Amino acid sequence: MVEDADADRLAASLAGRLDAVTFTDLTTDQVTARLIDAVADWAGEQGWRVYRRAPSVLPLPPPMSARQSVLDVACARPDGPPVVVEVDHGTRRRTWEKLLAEADAGRVTLWVRWGAGRFTAPPPPIRMVSCAVHRRPDPTGVLHSRRPRADRLPPVHSAVPQGSVDAVELPLPPTVSPGAEG
């Protein structure tokens, strides 16, 4: 089985790479393709051999069980076990089965899960790399957009800079409205 520290390090590295991925108004298929490209680029930057649509160790279910499933990206590393990556918009049991079979074969398994909602964590030893994407309806379907994390600044809470403030002892005394007589 693959070392947890190696898998965690690779998941964090890929997450850092995906943080820089941006796009506007892409379809679901286009987003998946863009993320697969980013994963392949990340792996290539590591100096690894990169294979797209590589055969999985898991066969397809009947009636196509004579054929193999494919992985979105598989990587051969000179300094460690192979790395396999699946990129999905939804949570599919079949993806988990495929990645678990790959982990049993000694590979580091990374699952890039993208979308706008909550993500269900996969079973160990699969590492999830989440990628938050905004969606909006369009007459042609749903379109997705993403800004890098660095551009998503926290909201400004006050437009006027505040100077020093004086502490006030609680409870506050009742206030008298202007024009009201006491």
Predicted regions and their residues:
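Short, surface-exposed, charge-dense and proline/glycine-enriched linear segments
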Residues: 57-59, 76-95, 116-119, 139-150
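Active-site metal-binding core of divalent-cation-utilizing nuclease and nuclease-like domains
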Residues: 16, 20-32, 37, 41-79
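Conserved short hydrophobic interaction patches
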Residues: 42, 102-106, 155, 162
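Hydrophobic face of amphipathic alpha-helices
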Residues: 6-19
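Catalytic cores of nucleic-acid endonucleases
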Residues: 81-134
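Conserved phosphoryl-transfer catalytic core
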Residues: 3
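Intrinsically disordered, low-complexity regulatory regions of eukaryotic regulatory proteins
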Residues: 70, 84, 164-167
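Domain-level recognition of nuclease-like catalytic cores that cleave nucleotide substrates
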Residues: 114-182
